[in-house]
Regions:
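Bacterial N-terminal signal peptides that target proteins for export
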Residues: 1-8
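Short, solvent-exposed coil/turn linker segments
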Residues: 3, 44-47, 58-61, 146, ...
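Long, low-complexity, intrinsically disordered regions
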Residues: 21-134, 141
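Catalytic toxin/effector domains delivered as secreted proteins or via bacterial secretion systems
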Residues: 90-231
């Protein structure tokens, strides 16, 4: 069963009612948007544990992780478009000292994580990200989603890892949910998470969740922990 435990009352007002969560030191439960969903029907935990034991090095260095996302030709065509040029401008603004080759490589990596061309949208609302319980959000990670999309994924996928195409290194029984806020109205690039595979196909994820690419994280607030959710 998945639950979402809230940690900061200030953020509860930003999300719609759903499953039950409880503030630390609070006496009564508070509704949050992550619903209760069925237990995972994906690969049994003992099988995943065995894979982790045998392939610890490959899992840790992500050397076998592959994304079946956009091909290079589609990415190059997108980068020549208006939205693609905006994507590149925001990458350059995030790291003005980076070379053109570095900016291009980052663009390819981020865009290839999706199976669809990103739609450029203005955004003035919060976004969220899940990380294994106890870990922090990288200050450079561009991959986020909305609380509504997290709710949708938790209801229709065997695991959140499956819907979001996570590598084994990033999969956990329990995730911390972090929220960021835009500093005004900013651009986001919305695409569908591509299928992924790892360890030569021993582990496959179907993807399909909606992701929000943020090529310039300096336009957003620092992440704030707002709760937890089960895989």
């Amino acid at each position: 069963m998945r639950t979402f435990r809230g940690l900061a009352a200030a953020f509860l007002l930003a999300v719609a009612p759903g499953a039950w969560a409880q503030l630390d030191n609070a006496a009564t439960p508070v509704p949050l948007p992550i619903p209760i969903a069925a237990a995972s029907t994906a690969m049994p935990a003992q099988d995943l544990d065995a894979l982790r034991a045998v392939h610890a090095r490959e899992i840790n260095d992500l050397s076998t992780f592959r994304t079946a996302g956009l091909p290079r030709e589609a990415i190059d065509s997108y980068l020549d478009s208006g939205p693609g040029q905006q994507f590149l401008r925001e990458l350059r603004a995030a790291d003005p000292a980076a070379s053109a080759d570095t900016i291009y490589a980052r663009a390819v990596e981020q865009l290839a994580s999706g199976s669809t061309l990103p739609a450029l949208q203005p955004m003035a609302a919060a976004l969220v990200k899940i990380v294994p319980h106890g870990q922090n959000v990288s200050p450079y990670s561009p991959y986020f989603t909305t609380s509504a999309q997290l709710q949708l994924a938790s209801g229709r996928c065997a695991t959140l890892a499956d819907c979001f195409g996570l590598p084994l290194k990033s999969e956990a029984p329990l995730y911390d949910v972090y929220q960021i806020m835009p500093k005004g109205t900013v651009n986001v690039f919305v695409s569908q998470v591509a299928p992924t595979e790892e360890l030569g196909g021993l582990v496959r994820r179907k993807g399909g969740a909606q992701q929000y690419l943020l090529p310039n994280r300096s336009l957003w607030s620092a992440p704030v922990l707002i709760g937890t959710i089960k895989n």
